[in-house]
Each structure stands twice: as structure tokens, then as C-alpha cells.
């Protein structure tokens, strides 16, 4: 199972994620309590080995903002959490994760407009997009409508429920942020526990 640890701001947290087998490291460039600058992410990325993908999280970015981060960090993947048009996703010089909020168990009508992107399902936004720590209603999702090799599950995951999410959705990857935090800060022990559980290692 591919595991993405998102919202990292400190070198010690990046190290904890990498050392315990994270496959993707997420840096949040959108307005958030986890927001970092391109320069900050660039410094953190120096400690990420080549086999671990660096992901930048954005909400309705300009082309210039995307390009600056892709080149400046550099990023392997951009994660789009706003109302970005499919045209923007399709011409981005990186792999793309397109995030969709799941409201009332319904998938958005435009979910198929991004054929080349990974599709991330998340709980509806609160003050900021993503990182709310809440799950969406897993029971109402028609899994037959989802392409599993492109599917990423997020929203309210933790070490206690991630295996159930994997069994239900058989996703390509799982994505976590607040579920590996204690008092609003990344917790290295929770990072370790989540990764080991998601990958099925005791």
C-alpha cells in the first residue's frame, strides 16, 4: 500500500515519515495551518530520497505558482484541492492528484473530467481544504464507479481505521495529515504506527 504523509513542516517529521517507509511526502502551499513556502519545502526536500515522491498541495493556484513550486522544490506531483479546471491539470508539468470532497455519499459529476489524474476522495472542507480529520460516509460510495489503480483515500484516517478503508476501497494509496498529529503537531510515533498498519506490518 502506498502511503502519503501530508502537511509536513519540520525536518524531524520528514525524517520520521521517510525512515518508516512513507512513499509520498506532502507539502501544503495553500492557506492552512500547515502551509509552507517554496523555499521552506525546498530545504525539507533535501532530506527526501529519490524514491519518495514530493507532493505539493494547492487550492486554485495560478500557473505561475504551480510552475514555481514544481521547479523550486522540486515536486513530483501536484495535488489540486480547489475548483481547478481539467485543462489546467492536463497541462501541468508533473503528475496530478485531483481531490474531490464527498458530500452525502455522492461523487462529484466532474470526477471523470480528469482521466490522467489520481483521484483523491476526502471529507468536505471546513475552514481550509483538506486536513479536517473527518471521514466521509464510506458506506454510501459505489466502489464500482471508482478506478482503483488511480484512487487515493483521505479524510479522517488513522491507525485504527486505515485497514478497514483499504479493505473497502482497495485504493492505490492512503493519505493522512491530522491523523498523525498530537495537539496540532506531527507525532513521529503516530507516523510510524500509521505507516506500519497501512502496509500491513505489525
From Swiss-Prot:
Q: What is the name of this protein?
A: N-(5'-phosphoribosyl)anthranilate isomerase
Q: Which leading EC class covers this enzyme?
A: isomerase
Biological process terms in GO annotation: L-tryptophan biosynthetic process
Q: Which UniProt keywords apply?
A: Amino-acid biosynthesis, Aromatic amino acid biosynthesis, Isomerase, Tryptophan biosynthesis
Domain of life, per UniProt, equals Bacteria
| Species classification | Bacteria, Bacillati, Bacillota, Bacilli, Bacillales
From the UniProt record, give the pathway where this protein acts. Amino-acid biosynthesis; L-tryptophan biosynthesis; L-tryptophan from chorismate: step 3/5
Which reactions are catalysed by this chain?
A: N-(5-phospho-beta-D-ribosyl)anthranilate = 1-(2-carboxyphenylamino)-1-deoxy-D-ribulose 5-phosphate
Task: Fetch the Pfam families from UniProt.
Answer: PRAI (PF00697)
The record's listing under CDD domains reads: PRAI (cd00405)
Return the similarity comment.
Answer: Belongs to the TrpF family.
Q: What InterPro entries does the record point to?
A: Aldolase_TIM, PRAI_dom, RibuloseP-bd_barrel, TrpF_fam
Give the E.C. number(s): 5.3.1.24
Q: Which GO terms fall under molecular function for this chain's record?
A: phosphoribosylanthranilate isomerase activity
